[in-house]
Design a protein with these regions (language model features):
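Non-catalytic DNA-recognition/assembly elements of restriction-modification systems
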Residues: 349-424, 545-570
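A short beta-sheet element
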Residues: 464, 470-513
Length: 570
């Protein structure tokens, strides 16, 4: 490579780095500058918005300040709606005297949904917040929210993005369920969680999923509302916590059964953990795409596991994340702009290939020569709990299970005493307690507690040769109880397994080190924040009997000695 080309590339990379710095830190720098100039917080907001709207703002501050802020804003190269969202998230809670960041959906997710909607149709967001989910849609838009102060922001954004919408300040759950107006599309990122409940019987009795109940999660009711707002063949895009998709408690299963029995589930796109970190929540979420059309007895459901959405989700303020080359340079488009590191664009292509092949109506797609391979599963693949969590339908899991079944492997259930109960009555004066922190796989070091101070998670009374396996998503920690100790108790953060005999103990132990065990374990965890594996599901994990028995038996013997020494030292 010539020196001139190398120099040119270096200059481009330096320009990109400066552009990224501006895009990421522009508001912090503006805010600090205005603070140093003695400008009050609300006035700072008015100055920035005034400049963006090209309104005269010199009555609020000096010309020098205005010109400095203008110059800084001129260096920003991100979409207008993204700038508005960043500004509102930064200042909104001060300007409107209310915490508002709960209402924001990452723009790349909004753009993904908008890119699938056919222009010129009707669309509604019944829990709109600031209306981000339909920020780019060109059609007949209806936005509804019961928070009047939030709708001030919504109106502002829609007016200045040139995106007209009819906006209503209503309680959607109460006012829309009986509406005769129906829509081609409903988009939804509802309030969710066990703390967002309604006990209003007037609302509950309007819903199949609330009828006769004393309380119900608002998010569940919004799903039913969203479905009932659809025209025939209309489509719902619902961003929901993964707990809604995998929890086996009655209300969640009932919601999923309503979807499966009365509608057609087109697709499920799993979003990365912390996708909503910018809004201060670590809830794991997915996008459900559901069509108001009578379901077939069996059909294919599109799935995709999106790992990145264009933001660095583990950093404060979730700055943009860009694609890098192997040598550490930024990947650029033809205009030398850095390319966001996001997989939603590819997910769209895969889904459009799916809807084209399946001849699904009412969604936007383009025919191309490429034939990308998508993943899907059959409606008939679901068990009685109707799990929507896609991890157990992805190819990596299905291929692992296929190998296990082909080699006639048995499940963990076949090697353990399934009728064992680990529950106990707290009658002893003190207990030795094993929690996740006291396990350093495969060793453990219990802590001694008096009866009254035993942690509430201490639910399992264990004995020699019992196996404890962490229920949590992530690195699997485990240990083997190697001693006969009275009053030894384990946290219910573990799955407790009691092998049938010593041979079963060695076989189970050997399998804990295999990739197949890890894939099955991590594919079956469910939940929204702390994803865990149920005690029933772990017993359905396949394990192989063809192991090096003598090798793992010797390892177990060594662990017994090490644990004895560790506990003695402790």
């Amino acid at each position: 490579m010539s020196i001139s080309i190398l120099s040119s590339n270096q200059e481009i990379q330096q320009q990109i780095q400066e552009k990224i710095k501006n895009n990421t830190k522009f508001l912090d720098e503006i805010n600090q500058y205005l603070h140093n100039k003695g400008v009050e917080l609300v006035k700072r907001y008015n100055i920035i918005i005034g400049i963006l709207l090209k309104k005269e703002t010199t009555d609020l501050s000096s010309v020098e300040i205005i010109e400095w802020v203008k110059a800084k804003l001129s260096t920003i190269s991100i979409e207008k709606n993204e700038i508005y969202q960043i500004i509102f998230m930064f200042f909104g809670n001060h300007y409107f005297k209310k915490q508002l960041d709960q209402f924001y959906t990452p723009m790349t997710i909004c753009n993904f949904i908008n890119s699938l909607l056919i222009p010129g149709k009707t669309a509604i967001d019944p829990a709109c917040g600031t209306g981000d989910l339909l920020n780019q849609y060109q059609g007949d838009i209806t936005l509804v929210d019961k928070c009047a102060s939030v709708l001030e922001m919504t109106k502002f954004i829609k007016e200045h993005l040139g995106n007209n919408a009819t906006i209503y300040n209503k309680d959607s759950l109460k006012d829309l369920i009986t509406s005769t107006l129906k829509y081609d599309y409903c988009v939804l990122n509802p309030p969710f969680g066990t703390k967002t409940l309604t006990t209003d019987t007037d609302i509950l009795n309007l819903y199949e999923l609330g009828l006769g109940k004393k309380k119900q999660e608002i998010g569940i009711l919004f799903v039913e509302l969203g479905l009932k707002l659809l025209k025939p063949k209309g489509i719902l895009f619902a961003i929901l916590p993964n707990g809604y998709l995998g929890n086996t408690k009655g209300d969640y299963v009932a919601m999923r059964r309503m979807i499966i029995d009365k509608y057609t589930l087109l697709g499920i796109i799993k979003l990365p953990d912390n996708a909503f970190a910018r809004s201060g929540t670590g809830v794991a979420t997915s996008i459900l795409i559901i069509q108001n059309i009578k379901p077939k007895k069996n059909y294919s459901i599109f799935i995709e596991d999106v790992k990145t959405i264009g933001y660095t989700l583990n950093k404060k303020n979730t700055p943009f994340k860009y694609k890098m080359t192997p040598d550490g340079s930024y990947q650029c488009d033809k205009d030398s702009n850095p390319i966001l590191d996001e997989e939603l664009t590819n997910a769209k292509k895969l889904f459009q290939r799916f809807i084209s092949k399946k001849k699904i109506s009412n969604l936007l797609f383009t025919n191309t020569l490429s034939r990308p391979t998508y993943q899907s599963f059959k409606k008939s693949d679901m068990d009685l709990n109707l799990i929507f969590d896609i991890k157990r339908y992805l190819n990596i899991y299905k291929n692992t299970i296929k190998v296990c079944k082909t080699s006639n492997q048995k499940t963990l259930r076949d090697y353990c005493n399934t009728d064992t109960t680990f529950k106990f009555q707290k009658t002893a004066s003190q207990y030795y307690y094993i929690d996740i922190k006291s396990v350093n796989t495969p060793l453990y070091n219990p802590n001694l507690y008096p009866n009254v101070l035993l942690p509430s998670r201490g639910k399992y009374k264990v004995e020699k040769n019992d196996i404890l396996i962490s229920k949590l998503k992530g690195k699997i920690s485990f240990t083997i109880i190697t001693e006969d100790k009275e009053n030894l108790v384990a946290s219910n953060g573990f799955s407790a397994i009691r092998p049938k005999d010593e041979k079963s103990l060695v076989i189970i132990f050997a399998n804990l080190f295999t990739e197949a065990f890890k894939i099955q374990h991590q594919s079956m965890v469910t939940g929204s924040i702390m994803e865990t594996l149920s005690d029933d599901d772990i017993k359905n994990i396949y394990i192989k009997e063809d192991i090096d028995y003598d090798k793992y038996n010797a390892i177990l013997a060594s662990i017994t000695i090490l644990n004895r020494e560790l506990i003695t030292l402790g």
